Design a protein with these regions (language model features):
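Membrane-embedded helix-loop-helix hairpins and adjacent transmembrane boundary segments
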Residues: 1-526
Length: 526
């Protein structure tokens, strides 16, 4: 794609946004203790939790990748979001209260509370490596590509360094509070900007184009695809996507850390429901524009360039600056979230175990230093991503091999009181070995089977190993089950207490509304 010049007004809007977002992040972000630095003091209300969760989830994969996939295959890519909302209701109902009540700082810490430290170190190590070399580096690389469209002569590494400094400037000094303060503004800008872009798409013939697709029954506006579909076969919607969704929404430190900052279980649950509602809206503000772009900009070779193309080609002066700010907001918000969550993993899962005498202030200092090292490594690695081709699809497929063993450990830990540390660690390691074998000899084992259909095989295998190996060792101690396992009695007690509150304060009502909306969307676009 050729470079596109923007005028002074748009440049000024972008610069003012960058200055404003740093100021917002630092204004209330001074933290001296671990609870404040890593979890914002656990004081966030539901609407802040929801906006922050949504902003952190809109990564380069979502904003650029999903619009690109929509351009290439149609609305079927929204199945990931649709399934994700169902998973969010499940997460808020069963897992979130255990996370918050147990007082954990990191998701791997939950595995130690429920099982043992081996499972914690294994999962935390995987998260740190993936966050640095895939997520953080990917966000930096995506941001650099967008700026290269505007300033083709600029050095890629220099652009990456600038974005790294931008995100680090408000995340490292203030921790999660700074990140969340910035994410609130970024979420609003992202939503408003995406609505503006959607309006521009519809104003340029998008509505008539979508109407013609619906009338003709075109496959591009169908969520449910044939089993042979290369994008999202219908069976994958049932057996594959929910597993990946649980990993993304319930086991992902970057996202769950926002929920852990909630001031109560109820506020956290409502925040998740709010984020779920915003996630459903991505059908209209991210996916539909990608489909419409097939009509407006046919023949683009790289689908991942669709979103930047729409922004640069459709919007006038002023609005272009706002939308570019929204695009940068998504990328910097993601980077900030990854940076803070990864430093939390290193500090609380590893350093705090090594230096057991470290006080709160020292943990914060270590967290800041870890953030600095992480962003430097990611910035150095980011330019190498261009050598790997379609990283987003590659990462999505890799997740289908990484996620099932981890999801199996969490599900068994929460819903089986007999599962123990030996079984969990065996399931994680055995799942990793089998996943590696499946990856290396996938064609010989599964032929041309879609990766979403491979997920249940790995999940069932990992569940079976955890169950079988757990039988070879004593049941876990009673203290291992406190605030780490689901209790039917507690669920019934909660049901009785919720019967006494107003319906609009009942998170289950809003969860039910989200599930109904998911069903309606699935029916309309079946």
């Amino acid at each position: 794609m050729n470079s596109i010049a923007i005028n002074f007004v748009d440049c000024a809007i972008i610069v003012l946004y960058l200055i404003f977002i740093i100021w917002c992040g630092l204004r209330n972000g001074k933290s001296s203790d671990a609870g404040s630095y890593f979890l914002a003091g656990r004081t966030m209300p539901w609407w802040i939790v929801g906006l922050s969760l949504f902003a952190a989830s809109i990564s380069s994969t979502t904003l650029i990748g999903q619009s690109g996939d929509a351009y290439h295959t149609g609305v079927a890519v929204f199945n990931y979001n649709l399934t994700g909302v169902v998973v969010m209701v499940f997460f808020a109902t069963f897992l979130l209260p255990l996370y918050i009540r147990s007082g954990i700082f990191t998701i791997p810490e939950f595995l130690e509370r429920r099982f043992d430290k081996r499972s914690r170190y294994y999962f935390s190590g995987i998260c740190i490596v993936g966050n640095i070399f895939l997520d953080a580096a990917g966000a930096l690389y995506a941001a650099a590509l967008i700026i290269k469209l505007l300033f083709p002569e600029a050095d890629l590494q220099l652009i990456i360094i600038i974005f790294a400094v931008l995100a680090a400037s408000y995340t490292i000094p203030g921790g999660l509070s700074s990140a969340i303060n910035a994410e609130l503004i970024q979420a609003v800008i992202l939503i408003v900007g995406s609505v503006i872009l959607t309006g521009a798409c519809f104003a340029n013939g998008g509505f008539d184009y979508l109407a013609s697709l619906f009338e003709s029954g075109d496959m591009s506006v169908r969520l449910i695809r044939p089993l042979t579909d290369t994008a999202t076969p219908w069976l994958g919607l049932i057996v594959g996507m929910p597993v990946l969704g649980i990993y993304f929404w319930a086991n992902n430190q970057t996202l769950v850390q926002r929920v852990l900052s909630a001031r109560s279980v109820d506020e956290g649950r409502k925040g998740v429901m709010f984020a779920g509602a915003l996630t459903l809206a991505t059908l209209f503000i991210i996916v539909f524009p990608g489909v419409i772009a097939r009509h407006l900009f046919p023949g683009i070779e790289k689908p991942d360039m669709i979103y930047p193309t729409m922004v640069l080609r459709l919007l006038p002066t002023g609005l272009l600056g706002i939308m570019l700010s929204a695009l940068l907001a998504a990328l910097t918000s993601t980077l900030s979230a990854i940076l803070n969550s990864t430093s939390t993993l290193f500090t609380m899962d590893f350093y705090a175990k090594i230096d057991k005498r470290a006080d709160e202030r020292k943990l914060v200092r270590v967290g800041k230093l870890a953030s600095l090292v992480i962003i430097v490594i990611a910035a150095l690695w980011a330019p190498q991503i261009g050598r790997f081709g379609s990283l987003l699809k590659y990462y999505q497929e890799m997740l289908s091999y990484i996620a099932p063993p981890v999801v199996a450990a969490f599900l068994m830990g929460v819903f089986s009181r007999r599962a123990n540390g030996r079984g969990a660690f065996a399931g994680l390691i055995a799942g990793l070995v089998v996943a590696a074998a499946m990856l290396l000899w996938r064609t010989e084992i599964f032929g041309g089977m879609h990766f979403l259909l491979i997920v249940p095989f790995l999940l069932v295998f990992s569940l079976s190993v955890i169950w079988a190996v757990s039988r070879t060792a004593p049941a876990p101690r009673p203290d291992k089950l406190i605030d780490t396992t689901f209790s039917a009695a507690d669920f019934r007690a909660e049901t009785r207490s919720l019967a006494e509150v107003s319906w609009w304060r009942n998170y289950r009502v809003w969860g039910g509304v989200l599930l109904v909306l998911c069903m309606l969307i699935l029916i309309i676009f079946r």
